[in-house]
Amino acid sequence: MAPMADSSVDDLKNDVKRLEQRIAELESRLAGHGGVAAATESVRMILMGPPGAGKGTQAPRIKEKFCACHLATGDMLRAQVAAKTPLGREAKKIMDAGGLVSDEIMVNMIKTELENNQECARGFILDGFPRTVTQAEKLDGMLAATKKPLQHAVELQIDDGLLVSRITGRLVHPASGRSYHKIFNPPKAPMTDDVTGEPLIQRSDDNAETLKKRLSTYHAQTAPVVAYYQKTGIWKPIDASQEPGQVWKSLLKIFDDKAMVAGRSGSLLNKIGLKN
C-alpha cells in the first residue's frame, strides 16, 4: 500500500482538528447549566413519574434546551375538545357518555400534534402517555411509521410518603402547567407565576386521601410499562427526591453522550496515528 502524501496527511489532520473543535463545542453546550442544544440535536422521549414527582418542573427545562414540544396528553386532549377538532369532537362524545377515550384516538392526537406543531420539529417530550403496555406498543408503531422512534423513557422515582408532603403544598399555573411548591420551590412572588405574573392555583385533588388513591393506580399501571421500556433498552430511572437542580443534572447525564463520542474519537485518532 502506497504511503499517504504529506498534503493528504495535513488535510486529514486539519479535518480531525475541526472535528475535535466541534466535539468540544457540543460538550461545552451540554455541560454546566445545560444551555440550548446544537441545531442538529433533538430529543424524543417519554417523561414518566407519579403525580408530584417533578415532571411539571423538568419538562419545561427539557423543552427549552432542545427547542422541542411538551405534549402533556391531558392538556392536549382538553385543547382538542375545546377547539372542536374532529378528534376532539369524537373524544367529547365518548367522555360525555362516561367512557374512556380510546388508545387509537390518543395516538392519533399525538401524531397530529407531531405533524402540525412547529415546536415538535426538534423533538418532543411526552407526559402522561402511555399508561399501558398496549398504548406503548401502539405509540411505538406510530412513531416507527413516521421514522421518529423514542430515544428515552425517563422515570422520575420518589417515595410515596415524600410525595404526599410535596403535593399538599403544590401550586400550579393552569395555562402552562408550570408547578411550584409553597416550601420546596416557591414562586418569586406569593401565588404568582414567575413567567407571566398570572395567579397560581392549588388543585382540589391535591390532598392526602385523593393522592394515595392516585398513587396506587399509578403504580399498578406503570410497572408493566416500565418493564416494557426496560426491555427496549431506553428506560432510565432518576431519583426525584433530590432538589430540582440535581434532578436536572441527572437528566443532562442521560442526554449527554459526550463520553462515548469523545471515546470513539480518541480511539480513531490513536488507531490512525494522528493523536500524540
Curated annotation (Swiss-Prot):
A GO biological process held by the record: AMP metabolic process
Region NMP, annotated ranges: 72-101
Spans annotated as LID: 169-206
Annotated AMP binding sites: 73, 78, 99-101, 128-131, 135, 203, 214
Sites where the protein binds ATP: 52-57, 170, 179-180, 242
Keywords (A to Z) from UniProt: ATP-binding, Cytoplasm, Kinase, Mitochondrion, Nucleotide-binding, Transferase
Coiled-coil regions, chain positions: none
Enzyme Commission code(s) on record: 2.7.4.3
Domain notes: Consists of three domains, a large central CORE domain and two small peripheral domains, NMPbind and LID, which undergo movements during catalysis. The LID domain closes over the site of phosphoryl transfer upon ATP binding. Assembling and dissambling the active center during each catalytic cycle provides an effective means to prevent ATP hydrolysis.
Free-text function comment from the UniProt entry: Catalyzes the reversible transfer of the terminal phosphate group between ATP and AMP. Plays an important role in cellular energy homeostasis and in adenine nucleotide metabolism. Adenylate kinase activity is critical for regulation of the phosphate utilization and the AMP de novo biosynthesis pathways.
Subunit structure: Monomer.
Protein name: Adenylate kinase
Species whose genome carries this gene: Pyrenophora tritici-repentis (strain Pt-1C-BFP)
